[in-house]
Amino acid sequence: MSWTPFVDSQFVAPSNGLIQKGLIMGRDGTVWGVSDGWAVTAQEAKNLAGQVANPSSVPASGITLGGVKYMGLVADEENFQGFSSSKKQGVSGVVLKSAVIIGLFGEPHKNPNAYSFLKGVADSLVNAGTLQ
């Protein structure tokens, strides 16, 4: 099953422009669904899975998704954020037991808003029993 339709219809579209692109991947680095136009490679997803398992590595190494390197701002067992000043965009992610939910946001929207929105999506999926 591809999660791409869910990504676009349930957290990109309803975010009213806050989340520009989305990605859901397994904790093993397997891409489940990604928005069209966000060319996240299998290797980038695998690298991110390693960073999720070792969040202290994010501030030093940054996060690379879709060919863009984001400076790692914060990372812990539950979330991470990164920002690219050259691209004027950032990434925010929510870490679950089985999956990672990631959103790409633009500079006008600061990462706490993106994280809060994505956390709401993640909580809904967990509460529905869809993900853990």
Curated annotation (Swiss-Prot):
A GO MF annotation of the entry reads: actin monomer binding
Indicate where this protein resides in the cell.
Cytoplasm, Cytoskeleton
Superkingdom to which the source organism belongs? Eukaryota
Presence of keyword DNA repair: no
| Any one GO CC term of the record | cytoskeleton
The answer to whether keyword Cytoplasm applies is yes
Q: What is its main location?
A: cytoplasm
Any idea which UniProt keywords this protein has? Actin-binding, Cytoplasm, Cytoskeleton
Task: Name the SMART domains on file.
Answer: PROF
Family matches, as SUPFAM superfamilies: Profilin (actin-binding protein)
Q: Which Pfam families does this entry report, sorted A to Z?
A: Profilin
Protein role:
Binds to actin and affects the structure of the cytoskeleton. At high concentrations, profilin prevents the polymerization of actin, whereas it enhances it at low concentrations. By binding to PIP2, it inhibits the formation of IP3 and DG.
Query: What family is it from?
Result: Belongs to the profilin family.
What is known about its subunit structure?
A: Occurs in many kinds of cells as a complex with monomeric actin in a 1:1 ratio.
Q: What is this protein called?
A: Profilin
